[in-house]
Amino acid sequence: MAMKLRLTRMGCKKRPFYRIVAMNSETRRDGRALEYLGYYNPMVDPAEIKVDGDKVRAWLARGAEPTDTVRALLQKAGV
């Protein structure tokens, strides 16, 4: 079972925000997440990124692979 750190879309039509979550790579995009790690809100200026660094490091230590987008967001957040 390959674990991924990825984004799930939340919010209403034309007003998205995203949760950064840990989930199985085979789970659908908005499926049940194993753990919520933070969020990303691109609708405010500047874009808001909040991440729990300890939880992210724990999942990376367990072998979870972040998607390219999540990797870029984590670098911006300084994790």
Swiss-Prot record:
UniProt keyword annotation of Ribonucleoprotein present: yes
Signal sequence region: none
GO cellular component labels: cytoplasm; small ribosomal subunit
The keyword Ribosomal protein is annotated on this UniProt entry: yes
One Gene Ontology term of the molecular function aspect: structural constituent of ribosome
InterPro entries registered for this protein in UniProt: Ribosomal_bS16 (IPR000307), Ribosomal_bS16_dom_sf (IPR023803)
SUPFAM superfamilies according to UniProt: Ribosomal protein S16 (SSF54565)
Stored PANTHER family: 30S RIBOSOMAL PROTEIN S16 (PTHR12919), SMALL RIBOSOMAL SUBUNIT PROTEIN BS16M (PTHR12919:SF20)
HAMAP family found in the cross-reference section: Ribosomal_bS16
Designated name of the protein: Small ribosomal subunit protein bS16
Native source species: Solidesulfovibrio magneticus (strain ATCC 700980 / DSM 13731 / RS-1) (Desulfovibrio magneticus)
Taxonomic path: Bacteria, Pseudomonadati, Thermodesulfobacteriota, Desulfovibrionia, Desulfovibrionales
Gene that this sequence comes from: rpsP
